[in-house]
C-alpha cells in the first residue's frame, strides 16, 4: 500500500470526480488577500474545507451521550462563517467537498497543525473503498476557552493510500450506513 502524490490526486479528481469541488493547488489566501487556513492539493494529500453548517454540543437537555440511541437534542444547529465551540466541548460539521473513493483506495484524515496548536482536535475516520459522500467532521475543543472554526477554510488533510490488490468487499458492497451522506450526519447503528 503506497501513499499517493499530488499528480495522482489531480488526475483522479479531474478524470474520475473523486473530489468535488476540486482545488488543484494549495490556497493560502482569500481573494481579498487576507490569510486563511490553507486548503486544496498538497504534495501527498488534500486539505479539506469545513462547510458553514455546524451542530454544537449543548447541555440544555442534560441527556447522556449514547451512540446507540443518540438524542438529536444534544446539539444546537448553527450556520455561519465562524463557529464558536464552547470550552471543553465538541461540534460536528461537514466538508465542502464531496468524495468518491476508488475501490483500491483507503484514506486517513489528520487534523491541520494550525488547529492542533490551538487545542482544537479534528477527528475523521477513514474513507473506505467505494465510500462516497460529504465527510462529517468532528471537532473537540480541549481548551478552557471558547475556540473558533472557520467555514470554507482548511481543517484537515486527507492522505490517500492505494492497495496492491482489490478488496473482496467494499463499503458500497456491504451497504455502509454512511454511504452517500449529504449533511452533517449524526451517529447511526
Swiss-Prot record:
- Could you say which EC number(s) this protein's record lists? 3.5.4.13
Give me the residues that bind dCTP, please. 112-117, 136-138, 157, 171, 181
Keywords (alphabetical) are: Hydrolase, Nucleotide metabolism, Nucleotide-binding
Q: Which is an annotated Pfam family here?
A: DCD
Q: What class of enzyme is it?
A: hydrolase
Location of the active site: 138 (proton donor/acceptor)
Which InterPro entries did the record assign?
dCTP_deaminase, dUTPase-like_sf, dUTPase_trimeric
What does this gene product do?
Catalyzes the deamination of dCTP to dUTP.
Q: How is the quaternary structure described?
A: Homotrimer.
Protein name in UniProt: dCTP deaminase
* Source species of the chain: Burkholderia mallei (strain ATCC 23344)
Q: Give the gene name.
A: dcd
